[in-house]
Design a protein with these regions (language model features):
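Bacterial N-terminal signal peptides
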Residues: 32-43
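Bacterial N-terminal signal peptides that target proteins for export
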Residues: 18-32
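Short, low-complexity N-terminal intrinsically disordered segments enriched in polar/charged residues
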Residues: 42-80, 84, 101, 165, ...
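Short beta-strand edge/turn micro-motifs at domain boundaries
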Residues: 150-177
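A short, structured loop/turn motif at beta-sheet edges
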Residues: 126-132, 158-163
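A solvent-exposed, acidic/Ser-Thr-rich amphipathic alpha-helical stretch
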Residues: 55, 74-129, 141, 147-148
Length: 178
């Protein structure tokens, strides 16, 4: 701890003196060491399984979005997004905020099945940032009668009570091929 000494200089003050620390018996020290190792081993073995489960759950959300899109179900597609005013969607040099705003944009831009085409996600990479947040990136492509728009996306997902949901979507389209 730092405090001013009698001369007004900043000085380090010891919080504990050696007399304040009580000795630990060898048996208790072994028990503490063994228990600590067991807890770390349990945590280490659970982490890969939790990571795999989270990645599988996120892949399922994106697959459900793709399936809903390919049925012409924009509302079903939107189930992958957090129903929140803070949900963000960035594309076409525009930032849209709020679940309803994002849904309305999809409904306007893809007002019929021919405009929707068939959606395919590929090159999916998912990285957990914590136990309740992840980033996913990949490619998207729409197969339509007259064109095949495609591009890249980066998503930030959060684990909410209803499951993993997209809270931030940055999608870009490649220039059309001549």
């Amino acid at each position: 701890m730092l405090e001013l000494d009698a001369a007004g200089h900043l000085a380090y003050k010891r919080l504990l003196s050696p007399q304040m620390i009580s000795p630990v018996s060898p048996a208790r020290a072994r028990w503490i060491a063994i228990t600590s190792c067991m807890l770390m081993a349990i945590r280490a073995s659970a982490a890969p399984e939790q990571t795999a489960n989270a990645i599988t759950e996120i892949r399922s959300v994106l697959q459900a979005q793709q399936d809903a899109w390919n049925r012409g179900d924009i509302d079903g597609f939107m189930n992958g997004y957090a129903r929140s005013a803070s949900t963000v969607f960035i594309s076409e040099d525009t930032v849209r905020r709020g679940w309803e705003t994002v849904r309305d944009r999809y409904r306007e831009k893809y007002s019929n099945r021919s405009k929707m085409g068939t959606l395919a996600f590929s090159d999916l990479e998912i990285t957990l940032l914590s136990s309740d947040s992840a980033v996913a990136s990949g490619s998207w492509k729409l197969n339509r009668a007259n064109d095949q728009p495609h591009g890249q996306f980066t998503l930030i997902l959060k684990r909410l009570p209803e499951g993993w949901r997209i809270v931030h979507d940055h999608t870009s389209a490649a220039p059309p091929t001549p």
